[in-house]
Amino acid sequence: MIVQAILAILITHYCISLYRRSKLRHIPTLGYSWPLLSYITAFKYEKHGFKLVEEGYRKFPNKVWKIRTLDEQAGDGWYIIANGTQSVEDISKAPNDQLSSTIFFGSDITTNPYHVNVVRLGMKKNIVLQYHEMYREIRDTLEDSLKLTSTGDGEAQSEKTCPFSRLLTCLPPPSEWVTLPLSQTILEACARVYARLVVGHPHSENPEYTRIFAGAVKHILEGKNLRVYPKFLRPFISRVSIKTHGDIQRLADLIEPLLKAIKREEKKHNGDDWPEKPRNILSWTLDEARRSGVSELPCDIAKRLYLTALSLEGISRTVALALYELSIRPASVYLNDIREEVRTVIEEVARFSPAPNQDALKLYEEQRGWEKIAIDMMHKLDSFVKEVLRYHDNQPVHLGSRVLKDFVFSDGTFIPAGSTLFVNSRGAHMDEELLENADTFNGFRYFKEQDQDQPRALAEQVGARDPLTRTAFAYYTFGYGKHACPGRFTASYIIKTMLARILTDYDFELTESTQVYAETHRFPDESAMEMRFRKKVEE
């Protein structure tokens, strides 16, 4: 009986797969397409996804094609991938009720993804105010994370690996080096910055926020592995093996008194804004929840904050890989030029900054020259970061969308509702017709020397080049068009400010144990990267 039941399930699954595949039969396939044989391709995609996506880009130029994956959350495991600029344009113009990128986050999130408005409106609208908070936390975080002071007993701790959790107890004198696990150190630093943007200072000093937000990256990514399991098993496996539920509950406990305080003040001021109202992500999330008519409970708001923390993975990874790329080459190639640009821009902005009133004098002295406009003027740094994002993109496809209603590309290709659609970013990023020497890292690829001839007035310098936040047909890291990532502006300022401060204040180098892949398109083992830091020695 058991064997018969298993056979019945397999036959039923096979028949359903045949039916669903028939709806996609008109779309060309890379690899096997028959239900059982297609799993061979699916396992190959798990291990060699980049190579297969590049092969599909060459085999089906400017066309739409499909490949079988183990992602059962997709339309029966099939990814439909679009090649070429016209396909990207078609997708970018599709309305949200036809193509939805939020459908992957679960029903309670996707029914009303109001947290997107928090990023798009609250954070972007208040970017100048947020930048001041961001800068101060980055400065303080780096001083704590890379704080090169004496250990108290006078003994140098150089050339020893120092775990982030024990950093303050094993630090060397200023002239010595401290070795850190690069990826984890930068991730925890970014989590501290995000915590300050969420709840503000001094609440963000609670280390629980850093632990939760840094852990969110790991746990949400672990949750993606659930896609290979049948739908009915996912809730059980999630409860047993994924720690997101406990972290979200702990985050809810932390923000509950802060939400109550906001509501008390609102009641006192008859619902109107008041001068001391927090200007942070938590407050904006509460406002958006009300406007959307959804739950204001701490656990529901905590879910949104936790989900948004997933962006820390890309932010911290970019900072770490930028330091890696700077370290594997002589300083004369990129490091010296970018350091000089940072120094020059900060001095220039400080010179042009208006004199503050007495109340703002302390902030002015602390932050002299470190303004949002200064980061906008660091064009070599911007180009370098943009190239890191392109060259080290860890996703072969972008602009993932669930097709909610039947969709037709401009060339007539029909995509049925229920399908999962992506854009072939890897193919475009490596296309020699779009980018010269695309398989080679060129940190100043997006930097144009002729812009140096423009007048030096600050306002005319801003936006003089093609910044990393501007999407293009050959650059899909942040998406494209109206489906582009709304948080890319905040992410950009965190990445560039953190790098600029490190370049200004610290010397750094990779340890001998870190494997280097210079001039070859191979990703380093990010979990094993170690880097030495010391207070910058002036020459």
Predicted regions mapped to residue ranges:
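Cytochrome P450 heme-binding "Cys pocket" and the immediately downstream C-terminal segment
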Residues: R470-T471, T477, K482, R488-P524
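Cytochrome P450 heme-thiolate monooxygenase catalytic core
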Residues: M134-V319, N336-D337
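Cytochrome P450 catalytic-core helices
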Residues: I315-E341, P486-Y506
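Conserved cytochrome P450 K-helix E-x-x-R motif and the immediately C-terminal K′/meander segment
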Residues: E46-E54, E348-D411, E432, R465
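C-terminal helix/juxtamembrane-tail motif
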Residues: L10, T413, H521-E539
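Conserved cytochrome P450 K-helix/beta-meander segment immediately N-terminal to the heme-binding cysteine loop
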Residues: V423-R465
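N-terminal membrane-proximal hinge/A-helix region immediately C-terminal to the signal-anchor transmembrane segment
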Residues: V3-T111
